[in-house]
Amino acid sequence: MSMKVTRDVVYVTHDSLSEGIGMSQIVPLLIGYAGKGLKVGVISCEKVDAPLELRETLSQNGIYWKPIKFGRYGPLGGFGRVIRLALFLPKAKVFHCRGDISATATSIRSKKPFIWDVRGLWLDQKIILSGLERRVIVIRIAKLLEKRAASKAKAVTTLTSAVYPVLRRRHPTLTTNHTVIPTCVDLTKFSFSPKLPQKRKLLLSGVFNDYYDLDRTREFVSLLKKDLSIFITWCHGKEALRDKLGVGEDEKKVLTQPEMPKEIANSSFGLAICKGDSGESLLGVMPTKVAEFLAIGRPVVVSAGIGDLDSMLMEHGAGVILSNNLEDDIKQLVNLLSDPQTAYRCRELAELYFSMDMAVNKYHQILRDIGLDFN
């Protein structure tokens, strides 16, 4: 099928489908849309040639894929992606736009309604990750992207409830058609494993960019090793930019997304410690790795203030929120690892909030809410 065919929904993203986020978050959602009987398309920015296996998976589910080149990094690269996404945008009755760049590109090319799928405060995160605070012109352009996305969106989804008031403060005319849909996982692939391994094992999962606090992670791991006999593995995809974390890991593995469920099941718990000076950007964050650990039945250790995680983990007894007293935090962790009910509480939390099937249903309802009927 060509770009001239008008599909029910086209998913627009500047992320790569073949990398971790694409494989864990986007592809399952697309397949879920197709399972609803929708004619589905997707346009994405790829850093390497599209893998044949992924092409076949999408094709077998009746999903049209238009991969375009990711291009260069940096602000100029981002501008180029806006132009290319707009230029090659497939036709659709409605669009699902992942992030500011995708929403802006869609609004430039099409007048059809779209969901602005806010995956966090993008500009705020880029300032932290790329040091943009001194690049005034770049910041102004990025703010214009966010403003345009907010003004044109017919519906907005966020990973957390905590970030929506921030968006409303910045953009008073933002639609009130808002739904919280956290980072989700396929609960069938990330199946429940009730028994924690006898040997204590910490799995550091995924790419640890500058958003994560490796100094505090190192401090926590150092204290942990004094109290527990523990083996630490860092596991990531091919896209990782660093050779080592340097936080006390005993081994490193490079695995694909389909290999991750087994690796998590063989671990005792996960960890996600973000920098405390990340400002409002933390309010919009919901790390994929956290959802994956909870789905399999593994508790997580996280820093305070990450999206809605504080209340979720505390209410369900599914993890530890780091405090100023790391020794007490470690005691809480030991208690969780010794409690045979911990795995069940983690899975229950995942089923309540992080189910991909639930996300598909919510997104599908939003498409109906903005005036489309696929019957």
Residue ranges and their predicted role:
Residues 13-20, 32, 36-77, 163, ...:
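N-terminal strand-loop element at the rim of the active site
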Residues 13-28, 49-50, 97, 209-212, ...:
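A short, glycine/small-residue-rich beta-strand->loop->alpha-helix junction that serves as a flexible
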Residues 14, 70-73, 115-147, 165, ...:
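Acceptor-binding helix/loop patch of EC 2.4 sugar-transfer enzymes
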Residues 20, 24, 212, 257-265, ...:
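Nucleotide-sugar-dependent
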Residues 31, 83-90, 104-105, 116, ...:
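Membrane-proximal helix-turn-helix segments that form the acceptor-binding/catalytic region
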